[in-house]
Amino acid sequence: MEFITQNQAITSLSMINTDIDQPKASLRSRFLLHLIICLLFFVPPCSSQAWDGVVITQADYQGLQAVKQELIDPRGFLRSWNGSGFSACSGGWAGIKCAQGQVIVIQLPWKSLGGRISEKIGQLQALRKLSLHDNNLGGSIPMSLGLIPNLRGVQLFNNRLTGSIPASLGVSHFLQTLDLSNNLLSEIIPPNLADSSKLLRLNLSFNSLSGQIPVSLSRSSSLQFLALDHNNLSGPILDTWGSKSLNLRVLSLDHNSLSGPFPFSLCNLTQLQDFSFSHNRIRGTLPSELSKLTKLRKMDISGNSVSGHIPETLGNISSLIHLDLSQNKLTGEIPISISDLESLNFFNVSYNNLSGPVPTLLSQKFNSSSFVGNSLLCGYSVSTPCPTLPSPSPEKERKPSHRNLSTKDIILIASGALLIVMLILVCVLCCLLRKKANETKAKGGEAGPGAVAAKTEKGGEAEAGGETGGKLVHFDGPMAFTADDLLCATAEIMGKSTYGTVYKATLEDGSQVAVKRLREKITKSQKEFENEINVLGRIRHPNLLALRAYYLGPKGEKLVVFDYMSRGSLATFLHARGPDVHINWPTRMSLIKGMARGLFYLHTHANIIHGNLTSSNVLLDENITAKISDYGLSRLMTAAAGSSVIATAGALGYRAPELSKLKKANTKTDVYSLGVIILELLTGKSPSEALNGVDLPQWVATAVKEEWTNEVFDLELLNDVNTMGDEILNTLKLALHCVDATPSTRPEAQQVMTQLGEIRPEETTATTSEPLIDVPEASASTSQ
């Protein structure tokens, strides 16, 4: 069929009309007239894309054919690019969108396309967006691409493009997004690349670019996101930030060969939220003016030669979540003001020259790996106690002291002595109680006030009476510990929540359990409590944290006992790990599947709605198996306490939008929370962080719509050889389905489980040959 352009079609109509006006018009001419009219006006589009009724121009048709000719299409996505091009603008050609007969969008990501991008793409003069990311494209970027006048977005990341970045791209005055990350590009960054006054996002990370950072990048008035990390850039970091670049929010320059002093002008970027200079050769000191960055969430300068003291003013940046100052030459003490940063969930000052005691709150919140490598630093672990005050020298001892003790000194000494005496009495009392309990057990069932084991109505084993006067009920066979053992165990606070306080209890034999002490004023009456908890105690599933026992004290106290999970919570595992700990895709998918299986069991077999599913309530065992915790605890609480839990979940970003009106959780609200956790695993971002004022699901949905896929996924996933593009993309689609604003359109947990099995069949979910690297043991946390 011969190619038909818009003008040719109109000319044909005019000629046929002339023929019809003649008295002897042939039947064939009339037939052709009706046929062309039907083709042009009455044939519906081939897809859901709206068609404006205009046929593609000849220049654009030829340009697309040239582009197709130089591409390798192993999966046949471009088979539709054939024939006359008549259907190119009506939705018949894959990945093509038009306006008035001209191509405005080419969108073909994740299609396994190879070959190269043709220089004739420059014929598409109306092109606004080119999205060919996550393919296998090689060759150089066409220079003609930068000469397209209305070009607004170029996404070519995750390919094999080589050569230099065309300087012509700096001529595109309407260019808003340029993402060429994760390719094989080399040579220098064109000095004029940021000349566009519309440029918002520039990502050139993970290439082999060399030379210095162009000054124009630090003076762009529109730029909000700049990523140049993982290249071979050298020279100093520019100290010209802030004169015009006041809108910059993200600045990533890590893993280069940049040198020179720390740029003080960085403090002028008052909108900055995230900056990373790690693994360069930066020296000098940190300015106290960093406190002007009031919106800063992440600061990473690890692996440099920065010296001097840590500024006390860093403690004024209340938004700070991630602070990494490790592997530098910092001296002095850690400012106590940093302890005031309530949002801080990652802190690392290891391998510096710091000295003095670690602030108590920091040593309790972060493990020893955050402080090691500082020989003069103390107080961050049992093995690094701070030295006591030195005893006076012999010369001073010979001098008589005539100083009288003040009243304050006498009170302090007396209080200390009294405290020591009380501690000794408590220890003696515990030993006596334990000894008496053991003697009672040795009598083999004699009547008396000792502990007596009895089967409960629900099949658990109860220890009633005893020296504690309380009641301990075990759900799994013989009692592993007595009430006295539990109450005398060494306890370490792990977290607090609406339900109560969680402790890690170390028993006398060295075994560990997690104990949650429920708040007394929010629990149901004892009879209702026992009825509900005896049901929960029978629930067993590989992906649910088992309730092992509970204790009812003589004064109304209620303790519930669970298995202790040494890996901690998923939230800690994902957001508070060290820089050398990587979580590969098979591990993340295994966690997602485990959560889905656990939630399915709760909904279908146990008939329980969780109501407060968060990554803090998903715990990990030694094998990094996901175990959902805190399920069913709402049944033990009053209605008012349940509402409080829902409100807390909403503040953390896991609450389904309809709960603001319903006030009662259901299976669809649980699936929404599961979807948020899946997004958390895919993006590496915490839902508790506000992302430009929107929650995590909204941010992801917007990014996907704008084709910013490279910014959605955790960078570790994009660089992981185990990652399958189709798998993470389909998992992202499923997660967005789970967090749909309309509850009726969300899947049930069973459907989620089924779809995950289709995305990654079970036989491929085992841990791959690339294991987790140096994953440290974390304290278990069930903060929610």
UniProtKB/Swiss-Prot annotation:
Name the UniProt key words of this record, in alphabetical order.
Answer: ATP-binding, Cell membrane, Glycoprotein, Kinase, Leucine-rich repeat, Membrane, Nucleotide-binding, Phosphoprotein, Receptor, Repeat, Serine/threonine-protein kinase, Signal, Transferase, Transmembrane, Transmembrane helix
LRR repeat coordinates: 126-148, 150-172, 174-197, 198-220, 222-242, 247-268, 271-294, 295-317, 319-342, 343-365
Where does this protein hold ATP?
M494, G495, K496, S497, T498, Y499, G500, T501, V502, K516
Q: Which residues form the signal peptide?
A: 1-48
Transmembrane intervals: 410-430
- Chain residue ranges for the region called Disordered: 441-467, 760-784
Family matches, as InterPro entries: Kinase-like_dom_sf, Leu-rich_rpt, LRR_dom_sf, LRR_N_plant-typ, Prot_kinase_dom, Ser-Thr/Tyr_kinase_cat_dom, Ser/Thr_kinase-like
Keyword Isomerase present in the record's keywords: the answer is: no
Entry comment describing in which tissues the protein is expressed: Expressed in meristems, including roots, vegetative, inflorescence and floral meristems, and in embryos.
Briefly state the modifications made to the protein after translation.
Answer: Autophosphorylated.
What ranges are annotated Cytoplasmic (topological domains)? 431-784
Q: Which residues are glycosylated?
A: N82, N203, N232, N268, N316, N348, N353, N367, N404
Which catalytic reaction applies to this protein? L-seryl-[protein] + ATP = O-phospho-L-seryl-[protein] + ADP + H(+); L-threonyl-[protein] + ATP = O-phospho-L-threonyl-[protein] + ADP + H(+)
Mode of membrane association: Single-pass type I membrane protein
Give the EC number(s) listed in the UniProt record: 2.7.11.1
Residues of the Protein kinase domain:
488-773
- Where are the Extracellular topological domains? 49-409
The written remark on domains in the entry is: The protein kinase domain is predicted to be catalytically inactive. Lacks the conserved Asp active site at position 612, which is replaced by an Asn residue. However, according to Ref.9, the kinase activity is conserved.
What does this gene product do?
A: Can phosphorylate AGL24.
Family, per entry: Belongs to the protein kinase superfamily. Ser/Thr protein kinase family.
What's the protein called, per UniProt? Probable leucine-rich repeat receptor-like protein kinase IMK3
Give the gene symbol.
IMK3
